[in-house]
Amino acid sequence: MKIMKIFRHLIAAGCLIWVASTEAQSWVTPALPAIPDRVYPIADFGAIGDGVTTNTAAIQAAIDAAAGAGGGTLEVPAGVFLSGPLRMASQIRLRVDGTLRMLPLGQYPGGTTDPANFISGANLHDIALSGSGSIDGQGAPWWPYAKTRGAKRPRMISFSSCERVLIEGLLLTNSPMFHIAISGRTCDVTVRGVTIRANASTDPVNPSHNTDACDVTGKRILIQDCDISVGDDNYTCGGGTSDVLITNCTYGYGHGVSIGSPTSGGISNFTVIHCTFNNTDSGIRIKSDRDRGGLLQRLSYRDLCMTNVGCPILIYAAYMATNREYRALNSLTPAIAATYPRREVTEKTPIYRDILFSNVTAMAQPGRRAGLIWGLPEMAVTNVLLQQVTLTADKSLGIYYAQNVRMVDSHIRTPTGVNPLDSTHAQVLVTPP
């Protein structure tokens, strides 16, 4: 049976305590790497920037020499420096002012069978990639292998369980797979002033798949002043992530700012503020599923502008659903959502609560819905506040299996009117300014 409650009254001040708590914790200042002043020009180790010479051994020798002396900065000057996989070390800065280019598919060690990631490291501390230049992944020939069973593709930058990581100022283009992948027990990560480009996943000639821009899981993460357009998630993180701030970023093609789908270990104190989205498949996407879930709480999205996005707000816990009617999110109806089977609650059940959207304006793509908030029959999404939010779309906002969803001075505009809500098993409170 459809359960829908709409209350039109002022929300008691006590109900907004969690919102104030979220805003108070929103600013994140990660510790920056401490790197000695010593400089190591890679040309001193035999590197040649002619776009033809393979410089893997020379650049690795420079990294190893700097690490052996206690750290320093490697200089990649003007020119095009081809290289295979490189292993970073602690207290090393790789400053790229020219172009550092991955070897092409036909020459890259391991090919599609066992390729190492391009720039990688694990259990390191105080590492930086910066400069005014670019890192080019030459990814186009790799991208079709996304559909080849068993084929592997290298990531451009991959760090695991590292402390104090800085990526700043660079242009990252056309990675074979993820551009920045940081995982494990990592803490204090700053990605600032970085531009990331790859073809859209809908490109008619050569779509790029799984070319995520920033997959950064850990604690104390700042993504600031970045310009990103890729073929997959513009940002995403997994479980075990806390204290994240994404601010002043511009997003083009891609799947938006995402959380999940693996969320075991929980995600908390996550803030996105002062960002724009143009032509993204989704704006904000929170995704998980049974058997890979955790507690997601204190998520804040403020001062966002979205134009021609596929789905401005997408929150759901059925990411791995196999039934086609449950996967067709744009056409999901209350009647279909109400048939989603209930399961027993376990420690891996996704829990979504305390989510704020404030001062968000979005225009969806033609034929798309304003958004979707879809919990599980056994675990509803709880405490969602839409405050001064205006969503314009051809289809309404769907709210299924959700409790205490509050709309304050907010408007869902569709051809059928203002604030049409498709809902089932939901409690929605609509209040004036």
Which ranges hold each PLM region?
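Bacterial N-terminal signal peptides that target proteins for export
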Residues: K2-I11
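Repetitive helical segments and hydrophobic/amphipathic motifs
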Residues: G14-I17
